[in-house]
Design a protein with these regions (language model features):
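N-terminal type II signal-anchor transmembrane helix
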Residues: 2-62, 100, 120, 371
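Peptidoglycan glycan-strand catalytic modules in the bacterial/periplasmic cell-wall system
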Residues: 56-58, 62-265, 269-319, 327, ...
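Active-site SXXK
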Residues: 93-94, 247, 252, 360, ...
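Short, well-structured active-site flanking segments
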Residues: 102-112, 197-200, 259-264, 513-534, ...
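Active-site-adjacent helix/loop patches that line small-molecule binding or acyl-intermediate pockets
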Residues: 132-133, 140-147, 152-159, 352, ...
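Non-catalytic structural connector segments
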Residues: 259-419
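Short, glycine/proline-biased beta-turn/loop segments that scaffold the active-site neighborhood
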Residues: 270, 495-551, 624-639
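A penicillin-recognizing enzyme superfamily signal
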Residues: 286, 350, 354-370, 403-470, ...
């Protein structure tokens, strides 16, 4: 063999070796070096981070009857264990996303090869992508860093670096978790569309059921949506979603998880949804949920935040004594961080009863949408400057409208964008497309109107609030802050303070009973005059003229809400004593201690009033309203428990006498509609209230098992009915209470019955029939008022 041939063979051998290193060895060495670099220098999650992955878990609010009424969340996600997920979901995910899930250790090189050769070259995507479920989990739990820039090829270098990090993280996940734990974490972490993160939120949003209850076609529908949550959203694109669902079902059959007959049956089934998007504006008890968030997030009170010293002092005491108030700022996690309602997956056990809450919301809606709003809308048609009455002057009207414009979102946005006052105000006169609240099935209507007209329209919508408390515990069972949380965020239960009218009178009668008087004590029905700063004031009489000068009982006085009798009692005890009684019964808002307090000018909240009236069926014991019983972390560890604070405000004798007095209101007075229209039987006490110009309508009533109160009025006090027959508390507020109680009494799951009774104190033997006066207490309300009892109510001057 010639030297030339030998030299050529040697060169060929060297070239082969070089090309071997170029094509095979160098990539292997490079990949190995890259992996080592990633492990050594990249920010790979630590063991502790792998044990406690950073996953945004929704906080759940769980009702007293065990229903999750809503969540606080950035991502609507609630973790469920592997055992609580239907096998159909597991099989659908594995068959579609990672067919060799149980055969690899985090990275499936066989699948990677398939992606390179079969999927890319042969365009066969039936076996999915190259990323394993574990890699997808790593990408979800530990988000990718931003790509590098600044040099040629930086994007590709970054992507390789990131992919290597995902590989290493996936392998570490496989070493720390079982396959069951990994697939459960994956299903709990991914986004399914419609705001649903995690399989629990998805199954509840699309089907209204638990993950363990999902059948083959439901599981396939949800898993299929993961690829493109909007495109394959069954509520938005049912045809595309069904095509994708059927593909997933085919993959399940191909993998051997279901039979061919099951496949055909599932693919032939229609899509059946029980679709309900869970957001902060919808769902049960939205005003209550918002109140809980604010209560738990509150900061320590500062004097500069309060107009009145006594309200600042009350909240300062509450900060020290009420563990729920500012809980998030008073407590920390074991690592020293503050708890986060939107991320930490807390379980907050609230006192709301889901059934009572639903009945309360339905009662408010029925009264406003079917009765009051149509009447008010009809009355507004004849008004010069609706929704305000005709006696409003132009200056006041313009002031109210200007104030409303400055409080609007449109005005705030304009100021933020640097527009002048003139430019912003000009926008309010230009018609634009908008969506506004409406009493229809959708809860809104799309229309075109000027922002000025939209302000007037929104002000014309009557507002209402409702709260119910269980007497024996003080636990709040129902809470409705307004007609629609989405459009009217203002909470009229705890935020709104309105004049209480004649619902204040029971405090004065309570003082009289506590001081030794009885319901049957007799007084002369005469106007009373007070001297105030060298001036005189006489409360306007609400009684028929031919009843003036007659002897009546105190029970008659409260039954018919006589201003004369209330003024008589105020003369006996004085405003300071009445104010002290109100404080003892839980009234914390600021009010003036003046003689006119006896007829109701004080601005108080519905929450305060209901809690105070709850003292009567509670045998004289006042209880602060309780909203939350305990808080747990996501693993069920108890973080806090809350018990109510009970104080004896009045004697059980006084409480029972007040029950007797207020039963007269229901049986023969301004609350008689509960008997003759709503056919409510059993023992009920209560009091109506109406303020000047019919601006506010009140009713607070109680049975032995439930105390509930209602307020109805306009956003502005000047928005009101013209006629007392329509704007009284007995016409506006009392029907909500009646509808609510009817629903509760029909529910066999609620411990409320018309057979419930108020128990007299042991040893009490007092005749409360109250006969012998010039006018009998049991006189028919129609005769007393000279009109039907449905038409009017008491009012103050």
């Amino acid at each position: 063999m010639s030297i030339f041939v030998l030299v050529m063979k040697e060169r060929t051998r060297k070239r082969i070796i070089i090309w071997f290193w170029i094509l095979f060895a160098l990539p292997i060495v490079g990949v190995t070096a890259l992996v080592i670099s990633v492990v050594k220098f990249a920010q790979i999650p630590s063991f502790e981070e792998l044990e406690h992955p950073n996953n945004n878990l929704a906080t759940r609010l769980i009702s007293s009857d065990g229903v999750v009424i809503s969540t606080f969340h950035i991502e609507n996600r609630t973790y469920v264990s592997y055992e609580d997920i239907s096998p159909n979901v597991i099989h659908a995910a594995v068959a579609t996303e990672d067919a060799r899930f149980y055969n690899h250790s985090g990275v499936d090189f066989q699948s990677l090869g398939r992606v390179l050769f079969k999927t890319l070259l042969m365009r066969d995507s039936s076996q999915g992508g190259g990323s394993t479920i574990t890699q997808q989990l790593a990408k979800t739990l530990y988000p990718r860093e931003e790509l590098l820039t600044g040099f040629p090829g930086a994007k590709y270098v970054s992507m390789v670096w990131i992919k290597m990090k995902e590989w290493v993280t996936a392998v570490k996940l496989e070493r720390n978790y079982t396959k069951e734990e990994i697939v459960a974490m994956y299903l709990n972490s991914i986004f399914y569309g419609s705001g649903a993160y995690g399989i629990k939120a998805a199954s509840e949003t699309f089907f209204g059921k638990e993950p363990c209850e999902l059948n083959i076609q439901e599981a396939a529908l949800l898993v299929g949506a993961v690829n493109k949550p909007t495109r394959y959203n069954a509520a938005l694109h049912p045809e595309a979603a069904k095509t994708r669902r059927d593909f997933v079902i085919s993959q399940m059959a191909k993998a051997g998880y279901i039979s061919e007959s099951d496949k055909v049956l599932a693919q032939n089934s229609p899509i059946e949804l029980n679709y309900s998007v869970q957001d902060h504006n919808s769902g049960l008890a939205p005003y209550f949920r918002d109140m809980i968030r604010k209560e738990m997030s509150a900061s320590k009170p500062k004097r500069s935040q309060y107009l009145y010293e006594d309200e600042y002092v009350a909240d300062t005491i509450r900060w020290a004594q009420d563990d729920l108030y500012g809980w998030l700022n008073k407590n920390t996690k074991p690592n020293g961080e503050k708890y986060n309602l939107d991320r930490d997956g807390l379980k907050i056990y609230v006192t709301i009863n889901s059934r009572m809450q639903r009945y309360a919301e339905e009662a408010v809606q029925e009264q406003l949408s079917k009765n009051l709003q149509p009447l008010f809308t009809r009355e507004m048609r004849s008004r010069r400057l609706p929704p305000y009455p005709n006696d409003i002057d132009t200056t006041t009207y313009n002031t109210l409208m200007k104030q409303a414009r400055k409080w609007s979102e449109r005005y705030r946005v304009g100021r933020k964008e640097g527009l002048s006052e003139k430019e912003i105000m000009a926008q309010f006169s230009k018609p634009v497309k908008m969506r506004v609240f409406a009493w229809n099935e959708k809860g809104y209507v799309d229309t075109v109107m000027t922002p000025n007209d939209s302000i007037k329209y929104c002000k014309s919508i009557l507002r209402a609030s409702f709260m119910a408390i269980e007497p024996s515990t003080g636990e709040v069972r129902a809470y409705v802050g307004g007609p629609s949380y989405k459009y009217f965020k203002y909470d009229n239960v705890r935020q709104g303070k309105r004049q209480v009218g004649s619902t204040v009178k029971p405090f004065l009668y309570t003082l009289a009973m506590q001081e030794g008087m009885t319901p049957c004590d007799k007084v002369v029905n005469m106007p009373q005059t007070f001297k105030v700063n060298d001036e005189t004031w006489t409360p306007r009489s609400t009684d028929r003229a031919d009843y003036i000068g007659k002897t009546v009982t105190l029970k008659w006085g409260l039954t018919h809400s006589s201003n004369n009798i209330s003024a008589y009692l105020m003369k006996q005890f004085g405003p300071a004593a009445m104010a002290k009684m109100m404080r003892k019964m839980g009234i914390k808002s600021h009010f003036d201690e003046v003689y006119s307090l006896c007829v109701g000018p004080a601005d108080l909240t519905l929450c305060e009033m209901v809690s105070a009236f709850n003292t009567f069926p509670s045998k004289g014991v006042y209880s602060d309203p309780l909203f939350v019983t305990r808080i747990e972390d996501n693993d069920g560890n108890v973080l806090a428990e809350f018990a109510n604070k009970h104080t004896e405000a009045i004697s059980d004798r006084t409480a029972y006498l007040m029950v007797n007095l207020m039963e007269g209101v229901i049986d023969h007075g301004t609350g008689v509609r509960l008997r003759n229209k709503y056919k409510l039987k059993g023992e009920i006490g209560g009091k109506t209230g109406t303020t000047n110009d019919n601006s506010d309508g009140w009713f607070i009533g109680y049975t032995p098992k439930i105390t509930a109160g209602v307020w109805v009025g306009g956003e502005d006090r000047m928005v009101h009915f013209k006629q007392l027959a329509l704007g009284s508390g007995s016409n506006m507020a009392l029907p909500v209470w009646g509808i609510f109680m009817q629903k509760c009494l029909k529910d066999p799951y609620l411990d409320i019955s018309e057979l419930d009774t108020f128990d007299a104190p042991v040893g009490m033997n007092l005749d409360l029939s109250c006969t012998g006066g010039d006018i009998e207490t049991e006189e028919n309300a129609d005769e007393f008022f000279g009109r039907t009892s449905d038409e009017g109510d008491d009012f103050f001057n």
